[in-house]
Amino acid sequence: MSKRVVTVPLQGGKVAVNPQFQDALKQIGLDPNAVVQRVQEELKKVGKYPVQKVEVEVVSPSKYEVKIYLPPIGDLLLKLFGKDTGAHDARNEVIGNLSFAQLVEIALLKKDELKSKTLKSAVKQLLSTCKAMGVTVDGRKAEEVLRDVDGGKYDEIINKFEKQWQQ
């Protein structure tokens, strides 16, 4: 059996089960209730972050994978803060604040898209986006936090999550 992809219908960030979706899963040989339950479990891992799309990749009737796609990082931050655009003057205007833990969490969720070899470099990439958009981290400007990351101030926190990054 070749790999098949079924797009999961979403409504308000939750699975919207409809007859077409159920029929598509049944044709492949999957139990729609089991798939919906697994998709909901995966959505819980994403938590409060907005979801762009969810797909079920089916290799065989007994083997399938749930893939959750988040919006690009800039859009994710805007949605998180309820804004339409980033700061017009990012040096002086702040559109929102993240904790360093949230920054690490977003880096882990966006791992496949960031293409960074280490969690530290992924966090630095996110900090650059925060700087350009006017987002502070722990109430401080992103460039200050970036200097601290380079200086090793956050190594303890980053190392705690490095194993998750390597998986």
Swiss-Prot record:
InterPro entries per the UniProt record, alphabetical: Ribosomal_uL11, Ribosomal_uL11_C, Ribosomal_uL11_C_sf
Keywords (A to Z) from UniProt: Ribonucleoprotein, Ribosomal protein, RNA-binding, rRNA-binding
Gene Ontology, cellular component aspect: large ribosomal subunit
Keyword Ribosomal protein: yes
Domain of life per record: Archaea
UniProt entry tagged with the keyword Phosphoprotein: no
GO biological process: translation
Single GO term (MF): structural constituent of ribosome
Subunit structure: Part of the ribosomal stalk of the 50S ribosomal subunit. Interacts with L10 and the large rRNA to form the base of the stalk. L10 forms an elongated spine to which L12 dimers bind in a sequential fashion forming a multimeric L10(L12)X complex.
Family membership: Belongs to the universal ribosomal protein uL11 family.
NCBIfam families in the record: PRK01143.1
Primary role: Forms part of the ribosomal stalk which helps the ribosome interact with GTP-bound translation factors.
Matches recorded under PANTHER family: 60S RIBOSOMAL PROTEIN L12, LARGE RIBOSOMAL SUBUNIT PROTEIN UL11M
Name of the protein this chain belongs to: Large ribosomal subunit protein uL11
Native source species: Pyrobaculum aerophilum (strain ATCC 51768 / DSM 7523 / JCM 9630 / CIP 104966 / NBRC 100827 / IM2)
Taxonomic path: Archaea, Thermoproteota, Thermoprotei, Thermoproteales, Thermoproteaceae
Gene: rpl11
